[in-house]
């Protein structure tokens, strides 16, 4: 990408997007219950697709419902830069867990459009399937990366006995793309802090340098 001044984003637009997305599965106390492959998840996918297409993106879905929105570059054959997260939530989830990573990525694409900037590499925003894992054991990102078996995932059931593949089909989320055939130059995920440190120290953003594993 050529050097440009800092790219201004439209914070009000990003906020409005969160508020609108947050209405899908909204709970009385301000949270969100938008579990993977439910009617609410289907609505969220449709809304993201609508916004991404309005921003000029090519939107595609793979065979486990991972949703990809790509803004093409001068050289579309170069491996893309990818960012994103997930739109599904826990039963008692929040508006910003996961959704922020998807909508922040979308806002970058919108801001690039506003500034008339053409990038050297395509930029792709992804919404992974079932990242919270409240209904099914396998996440879309693990399947994409080849870390889980597709047939086992398809046959996995939620607590009510619904198969993963059947749930995909029921909300028309099973796409034609094979798993993993999308080379990336780099991948980033923006995520809300799930702890007190940044807020306590007065920082607006932090960079993750490692994982901490919790044992319950």
For every predicted segment, state its role:
Residues 90, 100-205:
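Acidic/histidine-rich catalytic neighborhood of metal-dependent amide-processing enzymes
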Residues 8-94:
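Acidic/His- and Gly-rich active-site-bordering loop/insert found
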Residues 2-3, 32-35, 149-150:
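A short, structure-level motif marking secondary-structure boundaries and short turns
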Residues 215-216:
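Conserved small/polar residues in nucleotide/adenosyl-binding loops
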Residues 207-211:
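Short Gly/Pro-enriched turn/cap motifs at secondary-structure boundaries
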Residues 1-9:
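Basic/polar N-terminal segments that are highly enriched at the extreme N-terminus
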């Amino acid at each position: 990408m050529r050097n440009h001044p800092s790219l201004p984003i439209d914070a009000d637009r990003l906020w409005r997007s969160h508020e609108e997305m947050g209405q899908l599965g909204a709970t009385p106390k301000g949270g969100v219950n938008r579990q993977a492959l439910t009617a609410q998840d289907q609505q969220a996918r449709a809304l993201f697709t609508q916004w991404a297409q309005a921003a000029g993106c090519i939107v595609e879905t793979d065979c486990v419902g991972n949703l990809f929105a790509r803004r093409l570059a001068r050289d579309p054959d170069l491996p893309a830069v990818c960012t994103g997260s997930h739109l599904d939530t826990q039963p008692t989830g929040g508006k910003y867990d996961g959704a922020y990573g998807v909508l922040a990525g979308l806002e970058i694409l919108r801001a690039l459009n506003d500034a008339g900037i053409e990038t050297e590499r395509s930029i792709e925003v992804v919404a992974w399937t079932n990242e919270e894992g409240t209904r099914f054991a396998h996440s879309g990102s693990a399947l994409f990366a080849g870390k889980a078996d597709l047939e086992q995932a398809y046959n996995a059931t939620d607590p009510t006995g619904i198969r993963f593949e059947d749930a995909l089909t029921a909300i028309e989320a099973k796409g034609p793309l094979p798993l993993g055939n999308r080379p990336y130059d780099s991948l980033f995920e923006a995520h809300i802090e799930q702890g007190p440190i940044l807020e306590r120290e007065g920082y607006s953003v932090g960079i993750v340098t490692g994982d901490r594993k919790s044992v319950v």
